[in-house]
Amino acid sequence: EAYNKALAIKPDYADAYNNMGGTLQEQGKLEEAIEAYNKALAIKPDYAEAYYNIGVTLKDQGKLEEAIEAYNKTLAIKPDYAEACYNMGITLQEQGKLEEAIEAYNKTLAIKPDYADAYNNMGRALKEQGKLEEAIKAYNKTLAIRPDNAEAYNNIGATLKEQGKLEEAMEAYNK
């Protein structure tokens, strides 16, 4: 209701449409959210955040190719948008495009070197490729940034187990 009042006063308020989209998305009204983001873009065609939000919403709907298109539009406008690079990586990884996902995570880390989750997901992609030592290095970089990251310890344990290093795996699981 507050967004509608804002738009009644200022109909070309792109931020209100973008924020309305976020609220609709949180309510699970994904199609309506995309409509709101598109209204924001009709007013402000270079609105990187609206494209990003469309990408996240499309990914939530399982429309991975369309999500990637939205992330690409985001990055064309705002090349240093770390979250768009990161979510692009996740989406590519879900499609099994591991090399492209790793490239996206590397771009994320070039923009934001302390993005722990990018290292963790890169480790998962490397593990899927069978590059177990590289995966462990990526997980350790996650832990260098966020020592309390339980998922990274679990991933290290699973990777060590896959290597047959069972005692080391148990140590990682117990951390």
PLM segments and residue spans:
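Conserved alpha-helical positions within TPR/SEL1-like repeat arrays
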Residues: 15-26, 49-59, 83-94, 117-127, ...
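Canonical positions in the second alpha-helix
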Residues: 6, 39-40, 73-74, 107-108, ...
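Short, intrinsically disordered, charge-balanced linker/junction segments flanking boundaries
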Residues: 167-175
